Amino acid sequence: MAVSAFQLWRAGGLLRRNFLTHSSSWKIPPRVLKSSQPEALLSVTNNALCFAPLQTFTDEDIMMQKAVKKFAQEQIAPLVSTMDENSKMEKSVIQGLFQQGMMGIEVEAKYGGTEASFLCSVLVIEELAKVDASVALLCDIQNTVINKLFRKHGTEEQKATYLPKLVTEKLGSFCLSEAGAGSDSFALKTRADKSGNYYVINGSKMWISNAEHAELFLVFANVDPPSGYRGITCFLVDRDTEGFQIGRRENKMGIRASSTCQLTFENVKVPETSVLGKIGHGYKYAIGSLNEGRIGIAAQMLGLAQGCFDYTIPYIKERMQFGKRIFDFQGLQHQVAHVATQLEAARLLTYNAARLVEAGRPFIKEASMAKYYASEVAGLTTSKCIEWMGGVGYTKDYPVEKFFRDAKIGTIYEGTSNIQLNTIAKHIDAEY
């Protein structure tokens, strides 16, 4: 088996080169050299610190982007149309993500992970989405939600048991939404009743991503319904647990290769050791994971929009009408420039939010801004690309119509665009 670029990185097979030049009297802590935080991307000029642009990356970041791009073009691109048509993710794609080290990007090396930065996760998701948003979503959930919940709230025993498998072979699924709990995330009806050393879960979940292939489900249920959201707790449920059933896939408009299923729990019995974190703290964990997850969705929407744009521009530079390239018409040039500017703004919002996470600084408002704006830009970009390509853009012979269908979900999941605006406004109200 070929050794992935991620494995070489983890093994130290690549030399580190940082972006720092400094005097002998100015020492950089070793951890900074391993970071892609803004603090690591600066130089010293005339005794003044000059921060690098948001799109300045470490050598590892650049290497990672190239590795993901190569994998996406060679292993995913040939299967995209078939996966979309059949509404099914090819197992070879999932296996490839694991083999390439893309399913444990931030996970510590002692658990078999790559031990890279949050920004690296964002860059991976963006590159995958340029080819297929469904694959990007699968990778996003595993890295920014499932693994993150274990790393932040799991016991040492849970980490040692689950993380090595989540990094190499086992897909996880985040189970929060219900029929009556969409934007009102904590209006959960699924409950978990204590019975000796066990909890018995009853209820159902809807719109659960990755459910078809997942082997481990992080299920949010209420152990004390009278206490409202303060009774919500996160439970670990294995796929083959008695009483647990996975329903049929939803027949969706977009991201069709990403499975979305209903789950039912009928007297599902799990031990106390299957509680992730503390009893009654599930709502905190869900909020935290969704906040970071929104940056992942922003990256997905950004990559999707960029992939569509990258495919369309060469076409309109070659397509001739009225004796000249359609790109040469000023009206079209202005539209292209407008879209390109919005793409760049979405990229900077997304990267900035990711770097705030790494720096340990408040990021909730910025995450909502990135997710909201990138989703809106994805919808605009893909719609314009179809218009620019004309009739052929409307056919399934070209990928732009799929990008268009995939883009719509960005304004809906991980918090609708209106929910993002509510969050942004709430923070502005507090700031003033």
Swiss-Prot record:
Amino acids binding FAD: 174-183, 207-209, 319, 330, 387-391, 416-418
Coiled-coil residue spans: none
pH dependence: Optimum pH is 8.0.
GO BP term, pick one: acyl-CoA metabolic process
Location relative to the cell: Mitochondrion matrix
Gene Ontology MF terms in the entry: acyl-CoA dehydrogenase activity; electron transfer activity; flavin adenine dinucleotide binding; identical protein binding; short-chain 2-methyl fatty acyl-CoA dehydrogenase activity; short-chain fatty acyl-CoA dehydrogenase activity
Residues annotated with N6-acetyllysine modification: K70, K284, K426
Notes on activation and inhibition: Inhibited by N-ethylmaleimide, hydroxymercuribenzoate, methyl mercury iodide and heavy metals such as Hg2+, Cu2+, and Ag2+.
Tissue: Ubiquitously expressed.
Pathway as given in its UniProt record: Lipid metabolism; mitochondrial fatty acid beta-oxidation; Amino-acid degradation; L-isoleucine degradation
Cofactor(s) this protein cannot do without: FAD
Position of the signal peptide: none
EC number: 1.3.8.5
Catalysed reactions listed for this entry: 2-methylbutanoyl-CoA + oxidized [electron-transfer flavoprotein] + H(+) = (2E)-2-methylbut-2-enoyl-CoA + reduced [electron-transfer flavoprotein]; (2S)-2-methylbutanoyl-CoA + oxidized [electron-transfer flavoprotein] + H(+) = (2E)-2-methylbut-2-enoyl-CoA + reduced [electron-transfer flavoprotein]; (2R)-2-methylbutanoyl-CoA + oxidized [electron-transfer flavoprotein] + H(+) = ethylacryloyl-CoA + reduced [electron-transfer flavoprotein]; butanoyl-CoA + oxidized [electron-transfer flavoprotein] + H(+) = (2E)-butenoyl-CoA + reduced [electron-transfer flavoprotein]
InterPro entries per record: Acyl-CoA_DH_CS, Acyl-CoA_Oxase/DH_mid-dom, Acyl-CoA_Oxase/DH_mid-dom_sf, AcylCo_DH-like_C, AcylCo_DH/oxidase_C, AcylCoA_DH/ox_N, AcylCoA_DH/ox_N_sf, AcylCoA_DH/oxidase_NM_dom_sf
Transit peptide, start-end: 1-33
GO cellular component terms, semicolon-separated: mitochondrial matrix; mitochondrion
Modified residues (Phosphoserine): S183
N6-succinyllysine PTM sites in chain numbering: K70, K278, K284
Active site: E414 (proton acceptor)
SUPFAM superfamilies the UniProt entry points to: Acyl-CoA dehydrogenase C-terminal domain-like (SSF47203), Acyl-CoA dehydrogenase NM domain-like (SSF56645)
Binding site for substrate: S183, Y229, Y283, N291, E292, G293, R294
Subunit structure as annotated in this protein's UniProt entry: Homotetramer.
Family to which the UniProt record says this protein belongs: Belongs to the acyl-CoA dehydrogenase family.
Function: Among the different mitochondrial acyl-CoA dehydrogenases, acts specifically on short and branched chain acyl-CoA derivatives such as (S)-2-methylbutyryl-CoA as well as short straight chain acyl-CoAs such as butyryl-CoA. Plays an important role in the metabolism of L-isoleucine by catalyzing the dehydrogenation of 2-methylbutyryl-CoA, one of the steps of the L-isoleucine catabolic pathway.
Protein name listed in UniProt: Short/branched chain specific acyl-CoA dehydrogenase, mitochondrial
Record organism: Rattus norvegicus
